[in-house]
Structure formats: C-alpha cells, structure tokens
C-alpha cells in the first residue's frame, strides 16, 4: 500500500518538473479561443439587425415580395404557394406557415380518419408540424408549420431559407402520398 502512495507521489513530482521545463501549449490555445470569441462579438455587433428585418431582406433576396398582414405576419409567395412568417425582433427564431396546404369536408369521416393517422405519423417523424383546423365553412384545413433559428450568423441564409421552404413541399408530397396509400389499402380490404 505504501508503494502505491509513493508511486503516485513520484509521478506527480515528475509531471510537475516536466511541466516546469516544457512550454505548455494549452495556454496558447486559450488565447486563440479568446481572440476568436472577441472577433465573433465584433462581427455580431456589426451585424446588429432585427430578426424581422433580416426575414424581410432574405425573402426579397430569394425573389419574393414580402407583405405585412393585419396580424403582423409577413406574407410572401414562393413557387406559387403563399407562406406566412412570424418574425419578432427580440426572438432569434421564426415560425413559417403554409396555410391550407390540404383540405377536405368535415363530414367525410373516413377521410378525417385517414388524415388524422397520416398527420400523427408525419408529426412523429418530421421536422415540421402538420396541424388541422375546422374553418367556418364545411372544410377541415391542414397547415404545415415550422419553427427554426434565423440569425445573421447563418452562412448563405438565402439557401437556408430555401431549404426550410423545400421541407414544406416535401411534407406536402408525403401527406398526399400517404393519404392516397390509406385510400388504396382501404379499397383492397373491401375487395
């Protein structure tokens, strides 16, 4: 037992002597990290732009014309589809919504069961949320929604926004295909 303690003490002494005579590179790394942090803070101070203004500028850069709605949302058209964006100045995240991406009659019970199953599956597996609402008319409307980070430090932010928008189109395709698969499976079961 005494040999174990002596061995540990000898190791500690040798390590401290080695550290004393050799330059420790970890301190240089710390100064490099501090310089990087200082540079990033300088960049963020230069790019102090509100989230809403960043959203408006980015929407214009992807070739769409942003418009303000009565609910303080940003409405724009991208590839023939109207989107709504909720961007608040004191928040680094935005909500993007594709309203009325799919609709059906609220009296069609079979369709409602199919859509409910598909919506639940999509919400479990995807990065977007699909929600349904009952409108004043006899329709049930499906909306696709996504909440994501939107800050000036994101490189190629126009491509980033296009990528987020493409998630909506992919989800809408999946939604239509899965609903159709459910219809076909029901028809096969009745035959």
Ranges and model annotations:
Residues 149-164:
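A short acidic/glycine-rich loop-to-helix N-cap element
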Residues 79-113:
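Long, continuous compositionally biased terminal/linker segments
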Residues 71-73, 90-93, 137-143:
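A generic structural signal for beta-strand entry/edge sites
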Residues 3-89:
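Charge-rich, low-complexity N-terminal segments
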Residues 178-191:
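Short, highly charged C-terminal tails/helix-capping segments
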Residues 160-176:
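Short, well-ordered, aromatic-rich surface patches in folded extracellular/luminal domains
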Residues 99-147:
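Short, internal acidic amphipathic alpha-helical interface segments
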Residues 48-52, 108, 112-115, 161:
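Generic alpha-helical secondary structure
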